[in-house]
Amino acid sequence: MSTQLDNITSAETAPDYLDEVPDDVEMSLFDHLDELRTRIFLSLGAVLVGVVACFIFVKPLVQWLQVPAGTVKFLQLSPGEFFFVSVKVAGYSGILVMSPFILYQIIQFVLPGLTRRERRLLGPVVLGSSVLFFAGLGFAYYALIPAALKFFVSYGADVVEQLWSIDKYFEFVLLLMFSTGLAFQIPIIQVVLGFLGIVSSEQMLKGWRFVILGAMVLGAILTPSTDPLTQSLLAGAVLGLYFGGIGCVRLLGK
């Protein structure tokens, strides 16, 4: 009888298997800093390679990004303006192309400190984050940018001729695309917060009024244009993602 009680007690006091950190190795602060420095240098080197590679093929990228503007003509208003635009496009594209490698370096740095339970969430979070980011880029390219440009062109069509600075155009397009990609990460943040038990799905749902206000503010901040149509489209997408994130958290039972 006493042996059975001892077994029950030991089973209750044993650490949960999912909460264990596998292959836990003690490292000093300097070891962590050295590894962080190595990961950063590898990521920066990869970005540099990606930027150079994208710069070689930058003209097709520029032409592809000009498609939403339709028949609008672009001007180079200063010497070297198109060159610096090309560098900017290559920079954004290089980071995007090398983002899987950068993400891999981040995972390798944080992985040793994660429990088995947390590692089970890592794969779906990384995959979902990547899919949502590229979905955000596509939403901006195919929906937000054409809507904003159509508004601007039609608003002044009978007053001014549409001749745009190529630098200002690409600043608008690149900023809108990447800010939309970041805004599409909202469900991932919700899932992580729900999984960690910081916020429940009920708490997320109770604050829907503040979420609507926050979505409108976020749409105004993230869109470089000031037209209400683009801001409303982005705000609507943010709201849809937020309530979709609540559904995902509920599926986790949180």
Swiss-Prot record:
Q: Quote the protein name from its UniProt record.
A: Sec-independent protein translocase protein TatC
Give the family per the record: Belongs to the TatC family.
Where is coiled-coil annotated? none
List the top taxonomic levels of the source: Bacteria, Bacillati, Cyanobacteriota, Cyanophyceae, Synechococcales
Q: Give the UniProt subcellular location, in the record's own words.
A: Cell inner membrane
Species for this entry: Synechocystis sp. (strain ATCC 27184 / PCC 6803 / Kazusa)
HAMAP family referenced in this protein's UniProt entry, alphabetically: TatC
Q: Which InterPro entries does UniProt cross-reference here?
A: Sec-indep_translocase_CS, TatC
Q: Which residues cross the membrane?
A: 40-60, 82-104, 125-145, 172-192, 210-230, 233-253
How does it associate, per the subunit comment?
Answer: Forms a complex with TatA.
Q: Which UniProt keywords apply?
A: Cell inner membrane, Cell membrane, Membrane, Protein transport, Translocation, Transmembrane, Transmembrane helix, Transport
**Any idea which GO molecular function terms this record carries?**
proton motive force dependent protein transmembrane transporter activity
The way it spans or sits in the membrane comes to: Multi-pass membrane protein
Q: Which GO terms describe its biological process?
A: intracellular protein transmembrane transport; protein transport by the Tat complex
List the GO terms this entry assigns under cellular component, sorted alphabetically: TAT protein transport complex
User: What's its job?
Assistant: Part of the twin-arginine translocation (Tat) system that transports large folded proteins containing a characteristic twin-arginine motif in their signal peptide across membranes.
Task: Kindly name one Pfam family recorded for this protein.
Answer: TatC
Q: Does the keyword Metal-binding apply?
A: no
